[in-house]
Amino acid sequence: MRRLIPIVGALVVIAAPAPSGWAQSGGTPAPDFSEPCPPVYPGDSAARERLARWMARGAADRGMPHELPVMAAIAESGLRNLSGSTYAGYFGMHESLNTGDYRGFRRNPDLQLRWFLDTAALVRQRRVAVGRPDPAADPSSFGSWIADVERPAPENRTGYQPHLGEAGDLIAGKCAAPVRDDTAAPRLEARIARPQHPLATGGVVVRLRCPDSDCLAGVTVMIGTRTTRSAAREPAPTGFTTLTAPLSRKTRRKLRAAGTARATITVIAADNAANTTSRTRVVTLEG
């Protein structure tokens, strides 16, 4: 606490200005209803267009398509902040998610949107890490991307893509384009042995690391026109991590019969902005 210094002479009274409305509200600015693409949650009773654009802006700030969260919310809740006993919010979040970073999501739509976008970013990262196309580049893949986030029953996975047009109509081009300020690919170091013995090791084995940043990594194995993929995995923070890409039963059978086969091995690293780096080597598979 600073020491008070007595003032000798007349007491000077300085009138402090009245606190602004912003300060009186506890530091939270009131929603700007003139903003066509609101940065602040507009409220449960807001028009569907404003709710959709709030979601679209949040997605764009994370480098993801405007329509993605809107399509999900239309399908899961009809674009309403539901309060069911087991599933709640705009995205039908299960009660088991009410913990950690998302604790209190039922009363906080910002947390709901954060959960959806966090999970969508992870799904996207996993896809590109195993050599699949970036779903953000193809609007026809938005539905399957959402399905990997929401994880509905298999028969309901196709229920998201039909809402692409409605989502676009609600957003109506009012929001700025998705941010793409992180374009630096992760640095990848990979060790791919030229002779491989997949029948003994359970698949094609590689060792890798991302020395400068967090990443997810995967392996693809192409033999002729057939491609198999490992699951994406986060490498250990230090040293090299071993990944194994299993071969199909048919490929193993052919390898036993032929004795050897040529394969193209690609190791891929992806960061959380879906930037990728790859290393490729042609190897000999020995039975």
Predicted regions span which residues?
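Secretory targeting and sorting signals
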Residues: 1-24
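Peptidoglycan-targeting cell-wall enzymes and recognition modules
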Residues: 26-50, 54, 77-144, 148-151, ...
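Alpha-helical scaffolds flanking conserved acidic
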Residues: 65-71, 142-147
